Amino acid sequence: MMKRNILAVIVPALLVAGTANAAEIYNKDGNKVDLYGKAVGLHYFSKGNGENSYGGNGDMTYARLGFKGETQINSDLTGYGQWEYNFQGNNSEGADAQTGNKTRLAFAGLKYADVGSFDYGRNYGVVYDALGYTDMLPEFGGDTAYSDDFFVGRVGGVATYRNSNFFGLVDGLNFAVQYLGKNERDTARRSNGDGVGGSISYEYEGFGIVGAYGAADRTNLQEESSLGKGKKAEQWATGLKYDANNIYLAANYGETRNATPITNKFTNTSGFANKTQDVLLVAQYQFDFGLRPSIAYTKSKAKDVEGIGDVDLVNYFEVGATYYFNKNMSTYVDYIINQIDSDNKLGVGSDDTVAVGIVYQF
């Protein structure tokens, strides 16, 4: 019974923060470094070669490694930094050996007492403060939190100010302001102009509410894309959650303008949706003996796409479960019941996908 009760406490902490189970490798004279990571043996099952599926087909094994460090400069001022890297384990040792390997996070900053923290580097955009509420599925999910896409996912060149508990005056009231620096890359998909975003959230006794917004200039290359016009990109999202008594419920609604990447597989053209409307719902329950079932629904619809009109980008029901042997070892299955029509005008995959994984994390 003791083991069951411990799992009921540990597992939610692991879900909220990937570094909750980190191994402390140095702690001396006000300097601390924690190492964290995981190895995931993962396989997707779908029809054929997975080209018409939600997520693909075959071996998807990967590993991640990161560290978090902090140094106590004085009684009020703390310096900190974090780095995280992804290693694909489904590559050969030949020409594709480095495919998919990438830096996920790399930033450093300062925190001063109740005034807040300020950091710069590659970090999460502030709109993910809302989208993170529903990015909780065993394998899938987070479908609208694209990386290198303005403010909704991990992105480079962001300066972020965060304040917790409103200067120490209101418990649970948090806000953030973020500046996104220009990233003009070779591809329009992962570029952006200068922008500013912000988020505000409040949590009380397991309930949470959040709103986030970001707007940025688009690069010349983005404005010249075949799909999606306009000089500004906008993204906003709201979220509600309940996280208490072993129950997790969350919902997001959000919209974007000239910001969500799309590709027409039939015409081989790409760009951005003029507008999207996004709905994400998640429900999970943590049993004391380690089982965590999950059900979810996600729909992202693009509006007014050139030559097409309205079209689904993502549309599925999810059923899955994770079983935690202990704080370090787990296994899961995640099933996507795809609701995309087979005649989708962008050629978005319509087949179902099942993921089966086993995880060691520290």
Curated annotation (Swiss-Prot):
It comes from the Bacteria. GO terms for biological process: monoatomic ion transmembrane transport. The keyword Signal applies. GO terms for cellular component: cell outer membrane. GO terms for molecular function: porin activity. InterPro entries: Gram-neg_bact_OMP (IPR050298), Gram_neg_porin_domain (IPR033900), Porin_dom_sf (IPR023614), Porin_gammaproteobac (IPR001897), Porin_Gram-ve (IPR001702), Porin_Gram-ve_CS (IPR013793). Pfam families: Porin_1 (PF00267). SUPFAM superfamilies: Porins. It is a multi-pass membrane protein. Keywords: Cell outer membrane, Membrane, Signal. Residues 1-22 form the signal peptide. It is found in: Cell outer membrane. Forms pores that allow passive diffusion of small molecules across the outer membrane. Belongs to the Gram-negative porin family. Homotrimer. Forms mixed heterotrimers with OmpC; other mixed heterotrimers are also probable. This is Outer membrane porin F. It comes from Escherichia coli O6:K15:H31 (strain 536 / UPEC). The gene is ompF.
